[in-house]
Structures are given as structure tokens and as C-alpha cells.
A protein has these predicted regions:
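N-terminal glycine-rich phosphate-binding loop for ADP-containing cofactors
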Residues: 1-183
């Protein structure tokens, strides 16, 4: 069925917007989110925030605003509203690679990271979680996933919240995109 923003963009933007809100709720840094959403879960090294910098924050904002306007009955409608830090980044034209700064900024040989609370760039901080340490010798992403979602630290909390909301949102999209789930 025809749906606003195509299903891939709809789910992808939901995932990123959900993360944006979760970052503030859980007090996570840009580096922590990129550590949690990169290769450890089978995604590219660019993870979340670096990928947004490459694609362009303006592109993400355009699609998110389109979903917000065109999907008024979506149960996650309010989640598609942009958080204040994204609005400030747009005002400052911190769109990512195309403007030389976004969530990350290169100064000489140094890569700086945007602090989402102060909106000031600072030196990169190494992200570390006990749960991630437990997965270092586990090769298959599905086996790592089992360890990640049972973690007893902030990373475990992050994965449980993040994946539960993503799986629920994807499941709720099924009747919207198809009447025949198994064809």
C-alpha cells in the first residue's frame, strides 16, 4: 500500500527520532549512542550520529517534518517533532559534512563532538559499557543481541527500550502497508 515517506524512511526516521528523545531521557552522549548503535549490533561503523552527519541533518529534518505533517494518526506522531537541540543545529546551519560540522566537527587533526546539552563542541570521550565488553568474543550479531538486551547497565537499558519501541512500531505498520503479510 502507498504510505507517506515510504516504509523504510518511516521506520528509519522513527528509529532516529526515538533515539534523539532517548538520548535526553537517559543522559547519553553522542559517542555513547554511536558506540551502542554501530558494529556491535551489525550496523556500519558510522552508527547513528555520524550517519546523520553524512546524509545531512537537513535531509533528516525534511523527512521527519513530512511524516509529522502527513501521518497525523500515527501513534508516534509527537515523536516526529524535532527535539530542541536539532532545531538549534538547523538554526546554526550545523548540517553535518556538507557544512563542516554537525554532531561531529573536525578541527585540524582533532574530531570534536557536540555536547547535546550545551551545544558546544568538546573533545571526544571514549564510550565504554560493561555489557559491550561481554560481547567482544561473540561473532554472530544474533548471539551478541541476546547478551546486549540482558545487560545490567545503561547499555542494557538502552537496548531494551530502543528495540522494544522499534519492534512495536514496525509491527504496528504492517496493516498500514499490506493486507497480506505472508505473500
Amino acid at each position: 500500500k502507498d504510505t507517506p515517506a515510504f516504509i523504510g524512511n518511516r521506520i528509519g526516521i522513527f528509529g532516529i527520532q526515538s533515539l534523539f528523545h532517548q538520548v535526553k531521557e537517559m543522559g547519553l552522549t553522542v559517542e555513547e549512542v554511536d558506540k551502542l548503535t554501530g558494529p556491535v549490533i551489525g550496523r556500519p561503523k558510522s552508527a547513528t550520529f555520524r550517519t546523520v552527519d553524512v546524509v545531512g541533518l537537513d535531509t533528516l529534518v525534511h523527512v521527519a517534518n513530512g511524516i509529522y505533517e502527513n501521518c497525523p494518526n500515527d501513534e508516534a506522531h509527537e515523536l516526529f517533532k524535532l527535539p530542541e537541540f536539532v532545531n538549534k543545529m538547523m538554526e546554526n546551519k550545523w548540517l553535518g559534512s556538507k557544512t563542516g560540522q554537525g554532531f561531529y566537527k573536525k578541527e585540524g587533526k582533532d574530531i570534536l563532538t557536540l555536547d547535546l546539552d550545551t551545544l558546544e563542541y568538546r573533545a571526544n570521550k571514549k564510550a565504554s559499557f560493561a555489557t559491550l565488553e561481554l560481547t567482544k568474543t561473540i561473532e554472530k550479531p544474533i548471539d551478541r543481541f541476546k547478551v546486549l538486551v540482558t545487560g545490567k547497565d545503561k547499555a542494557g537499558d538502552f537496548y531494551r527500550k530502543n528495540f522494544a519501541s522499534m519492534f512495536q512500531y514496525c509491527s504496528n505498520r504492517i496493516p498500514e502497508i499490506t493486507d497480506a503479510f505472508y505473500k
